[in-house]
Amino acid sequence: SMQYILLDSWEAGMQNWTDKMIDEFTIRRGYDPSPYLPCLAGRVIGNSDISDRFLWDFRRTLADMFAENHYKAITEYLHDQGIKTYSEASGVSLEILEDVLLCKKYVDIPMGEFWRGIMHPDLMYYQDVRGAASASHIYGKNIVATESFTGGGFDSPQALKETGDYWFTQGVNRIIFHTSAHQPLDTKPGNTMVGTHINRNITSAEQAAPFMNYLSRHSYMLQQGLFVADLVYLLNEGAPSTVPIWGSGLSPAPPEGYDYDYINADALLDRVSVAGSKL
């Protein structure tokens, strides 16, 4: 029977309104947003400080709603059916005002993605994977999955191993191939589409067992034990609250030899304790 549903990266464009938006905002922020809605069209209500405060509240409300009314709601519904969730919640496209770690909190297995080819190890995919690993660590989950080897084409197991090894060092411990098409036809190359092709029609298929066993054993070993970060980077409390996918990355950069996780305000308030002078 079906055990998991996978929610891919959000690629549905920006969503910033719903029929219950006024009610949702009022409950979450404690005041009626109606007088301030012209701020969404660039108007100033009261003064710039008041308008900016409303916009902060509005964006934060959207982030909370994406996490709770989408990812949490889907996960709870599927749990009632005996099904768990994987999700990139919400992915590298950054199409929504999200709290990326909060979105990943509400799925069973948080995911990132990495590509094979010219985008390895492009900053946005590097940060996306580190975000998935951070969500798993700070919210007490032991699996960090990735949409793996996207892009590419007909790469050899040797080339895929090099890429996979790098991402194992960044926190990945479960590989989900992009793409392995379920197809009855033996015509070659078959249904290929985008992604590295992992199916019985590729030339290395009959010799694939050692590589698959290699990935499986690494994944299993990396799922054991407990990650210990030297540093945590607190993400923006407002929205969007996401890992630094664009730009030059972490600032300040961690000292050489030190590892880190990201943390959001939710985890800082609810999952962090202080013993002596240490978090």
PLM segments and residue spans:
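Carbohydrate-binding surfaces of carbohydrate-active enzymes
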Residues: 3-4, 9-279
